[in-house]
Structure formats: C-alpha cells, structure tokens
C-alpha cells in the first residue's frame, strides 16, 4: 500500500489512467465489431462508413500506445481485405 503522499497520488493517477485506457481499448474493439457486422449483413455502404470510422479510432489508440502500431496495421489490413472481397 502507498504510504507517502506522492505514492498515494501516483496510485490515484494510475487507476484513473487504467480505467481510461481500458475504455479506449474497448471502444476500439466495438468499432471493429461494427465493421465486421456490417460486412456480415452485406451492406457495402454501411461497411465502408464503419471502416472509415474504425480506422480513425484504431489509429488514435495506436498513437497513444494502447495497442501496438503493427497490431493496428494488421486490423486495418484485414478489415480492408474483407471489404474488397465483399465488393468483388
């Protein structure tokens, strides 16, 4: 347990950051699911719109270091491949 005032403050800050980071990662997963569900329904316009918004969110959380940049690139690449396969 934190004993010094600065250790107590750091514990509070870390908990606040942990909750915020978890929320951001969850938002990223939600946007991925929105794209995948739009692809499943076959609605190309909705899938494209969901993809554009998902890419913005994925890039944002990768820039903040919540996910690795390679993981972000992998997600975007796979989603884009599914969109192209749906269009073909």
From Swiss-Prot:
Membership in a protein family: Belongs to the bacterial ribosomal protein bS20 family.
Protein name, per record: Small ribosomal subunit protein bS20
Any one biological process term the GO annotation gives: translation
Record keyword Endoplasmic reticulum present: no
Organism taxonomic ancestry: Bacteria, Pseudomonadati, Pseudomonadota, Gammaproteobacteria, Cellvibrionales
Keyword match Cytoplasm: no
Entries under Gene3D superfamilies matching the protein: Ribosomal protein S20 (1.20.58.110)
Superkingdom of the source species: Bacteria
The organism of origin for this protein: Cellvibrio japonicus (strain Ueda107) (Pseudomonas fluorescens subsp. cellulosa)
UniProt GO molecular function: small ribosomal subunit rRNA binding; structural constituent of ribosome
InterPro entries: Ribosomal_bS20 (IPR002583), Ribosomal_bS20_sf (IPR036510)
Biased composition (Basic residues): 7-22
GO cellular component: a single term: cytosol
SUPFAM superfamilies: Ribosomal protein S20
Location of the region described as Disordered in the Swiss-Prot/TrEMBL record: 1-27
Function in brief: Binds directly to 16S ribosomal RNA.
Record key words, sorted: Ribonucleoprotein, Ribosomal protein, RNA-binding, rRNA-binding
HAMAP family: Ribosomal_bS20
